């Protein structure tokens, strides 16, 4: 009876499976250090609820470096049972051959050993040259050969198909739900009525501003008598006979209506639509309202002085005032058009199932500088060393997880369907595409020398000595070991580029092939470096841009030219108006400002449209 009470109160033995309310302690996970758990005394193992890591502690509560013991095999032979074999996830067949895996291992090791410590004085120079260095070693050691290209591409296509299948299924399900569901009107009637009233106030505000400036400007005198009589009849509706001081106080009401959204009703009926340009619309409205209030305040203060100035200069009493109203008439129209055109409602993207015919895939040509051809090429030389056997000594680990390689191929497989071209061929095409007016200099034959290459850490000592001395190849073959060497172009202007392998500028000249095989002297042969195209691109201002970007740049150039022509013709037109209407400098400045705003809007609108289309 007494023992049952103890068990009921939770004071019994903890080994009987009953949780005790006493003896609990709070511990912190050793791995995430964020979650505190309550465990009972005597517990040596517990699992964190956040990171799901298993913590092992000793009797004092200190963390233990726990390693599960290896299971011991029983000496006795137990009964044998037939067990069905299930395919494991680790039985994935890699689409890469041993050659690709070895190249991937070389690339990964060279990239890992490239950057020095952050405390190194030339760390920024190394980091800046990292993209060129990575590109050069990927050209020397291609991570995907021509034999594996099809299988890797098929695997990527299968992955893309699965991803597209999931995305397409989601869009189809979502579009089906949108078609079947009825979109309710979430806004009350009071909001709709208020939106209509603000729209009426917005229209009346801008219409009154435009008509008021038109009525008091010199343009009204050029209109026919019938239209002039219509303006006289509309005086009582648009406050056309009001002075500048009255209109100034009236324009303060514009803060309640100028920020009206004309697409609010459409966006509420179509929740899936998006409205772009809302911020630019509000900024343009606020800027116009501030400019208008400032100008009206100045007109109301100095209206009498302007009239006196007109009489002193033997002009009509209100001639200057009419010019100012004419200028603000065009400015108001300009700001109204620009502000409303900033708003762009955009429907959701549509999904169409179209039968697209893919072009036949071409095999990518294998680079002649592959690691497996080094031995074959160097064996033809009398003083060459078999690079294949040397490089295979440190490439013994096979890459099973090819995430870097597959991601690299996934980024370039879409663009590089065509066979690869040599750097010089690609450079010649770019130079042929340059305009005739561009200051293109004839290509000079550079000379190169390599010192302290990071490849020397991986290549055996015998090959490394050859690399550090001077390694040159023929002009028809890319350099095997010289990755991003320092280049000095000798001509009218000397261009020196310091690259990370030797921070100081390396200057060397090509020597004639005077050595013989086995005489202990290093042979130096003139060559064209691997990264020659990139260095000529910098000196000639060439850019490796895709076709879409080049088209966009052409559109930008054309629009800027048209805008300049528009401004020039408009200025000539205003110069002609000076002789006829005797415009003063202030009115001329207002007209020019209005034209400049229109031209800027034209350029910005037509420039960003192709950029959004390409993106």
Swiss-Prot record:
Classification via InterPro entries: Ima1, Ima1_N
Keyword Chloroplast among record annotations: no
Ranges of biased composition (kind: Basic and acidic residues): 374-384
GO annotation terms (biological process): nuclear inner membrane organization
Keywords for the protein's UniProt record, in alphabetical order: Membrane, Nucleus, Transmembrane, Transmembrane helix
Transmembrane segment boundaries: 192-212, 247-267, 323-343, 563-583, 586-606
Annotated stretches, region: Disordered: 357-387
Pfam families attached to this UniProt entry: Ima1_N (PF09779)
Function in brief: Inner nuclear membrane protein that specifically binds to heterochromatic regions and promotes the tethering of centromeric DNA to the SUN-KASH complex. Couples centromeres to the nuclear envelope, thus contributing to their association with the microtubule organizing center attachment site and to the positioning of the nucleus at the cell center by microtubules.
Name of the protein in its database record: Integral inner nuclear membrane protein ima1
Species in which this protein is naturally found: Schizosaccharomyces pombe (strain 972 / ATCC 24843)
């Amino acid at each position: 009876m007494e023992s049952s009470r103890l068990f009921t109160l939770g004071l019994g033995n903890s080994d009987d499976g009953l949780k005790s309310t006493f003896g609990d302690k709070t511990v912190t996970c050793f791995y995430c250090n964020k979650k505190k758990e309550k465990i009972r005394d005597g517990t040596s193992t517990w699992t964190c609820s956040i990171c799901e890591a298993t913590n092992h502690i000793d009797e004092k509560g200190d963390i233990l470096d726990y390693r599960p013991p290896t299971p011991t095999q029983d000496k006795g032979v137990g009964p044998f049972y037939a067990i069905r074999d299930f395919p494991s996830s680790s039985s994935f067949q890699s689409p890469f051959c041993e050659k690709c895996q070895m190249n991937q291992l070389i690339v990964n090791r060279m990239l890992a050993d490239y950057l020095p410590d952050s405390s190194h004085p030339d760390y920024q120079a190394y980091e800046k040259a990292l993209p060129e260095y990575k590109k050069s070693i990927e050209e020397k050691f291609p991570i995907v050969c021509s034999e594996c290209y099809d299988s890797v591409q098929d695997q990527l296509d299968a992955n893309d198909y699965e991803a597209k299948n999931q995305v397409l299924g989601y869009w189809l399900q979502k579009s089906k739900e949108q078609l079947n569901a009825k979109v309710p009107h979430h806004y009350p009637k009071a909001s709709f009525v208020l939106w209509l009233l603000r729209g009426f106030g917005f229209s009346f505000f801008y219409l009154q501003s435009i008509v008021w400036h038109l009525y008091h400007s010199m343009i009204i005198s050029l209109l026919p008598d019938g239209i002039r009589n219509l303006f006289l009849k509309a005086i009582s509706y648009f406050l056309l006979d009001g002075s500048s001081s009255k209109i100034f106080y009236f324009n303060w009401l514009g803060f309640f209506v100028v920020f009206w959204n004309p697409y609010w009703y459409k966006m509420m009926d179509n929740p899936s639509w998006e409205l772009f340009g809302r911020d630019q619309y509000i900024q343009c409205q606020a800027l116009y309202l501030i400019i208008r209030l400032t100008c009206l305040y100045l007109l109301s203060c100095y209206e009498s002085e302007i009239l006196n100035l007109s009489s002193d200069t033997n002009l009509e009493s209100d001639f200057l005032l009419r010019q100012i109203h004419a200028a603000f008439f065009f400015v108001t129209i300009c700001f109204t058009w620009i502000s409303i055109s900033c708003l762009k409602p955009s429907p959701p993207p549509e999904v169409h199932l179209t039968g697209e015919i893919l072009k036949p895939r071409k095999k990518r040509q294998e680079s002649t500088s592959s690691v497996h051809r080094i031995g074959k090429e160097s064996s033809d030389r009398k003083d060459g060393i078999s690079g294949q056997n040397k490089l295979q000594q440190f490439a013994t680990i096979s890459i099973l997880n090819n995430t870097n390689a597959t991601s690299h191929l996934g980024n370039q497989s879409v663009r590089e369907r065509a066979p690869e071209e040599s750097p010089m061929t690609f450079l010649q095409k770019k130079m042929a595409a340059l305009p005739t007016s561009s200051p293109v200099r004839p290509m000079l034959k550079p000379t190169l020398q390599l010192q302290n290459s990071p490849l020397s850490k991986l290549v055996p000592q015998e090959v490394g000595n050859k690399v550090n001395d001077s390694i040159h190849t023929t002009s028809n073959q890319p350099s095997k070991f010289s990755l991003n060497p320092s280049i000095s172009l000798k001509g009218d202007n000397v261009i020196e580029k310091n690259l990370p392998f030797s921070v100081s500028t390396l200057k060397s000249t090509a020597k004639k092939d005077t050595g013989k095989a086995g005489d202990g002297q290093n042979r130096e042969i003139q060559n064209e470096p691997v990264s020659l195209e990139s260095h000529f691109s910098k000196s000639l201002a060439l850019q490796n841009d895709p076709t879409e970007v080049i088209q966009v740049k052409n559109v930008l150039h054309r629009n800027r030219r048209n805008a300049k022509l528009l401004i020039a013709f408009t200025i000539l037109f205003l110069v002609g108006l000076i002789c006829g209407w005797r415009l003063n400098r202030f009115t001329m400045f207002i007209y020019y400002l209005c034209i400049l705003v229109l031209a800027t809007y034209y350029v910005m609108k037509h420039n960003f449209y192709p950029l959004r289309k390409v993106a």
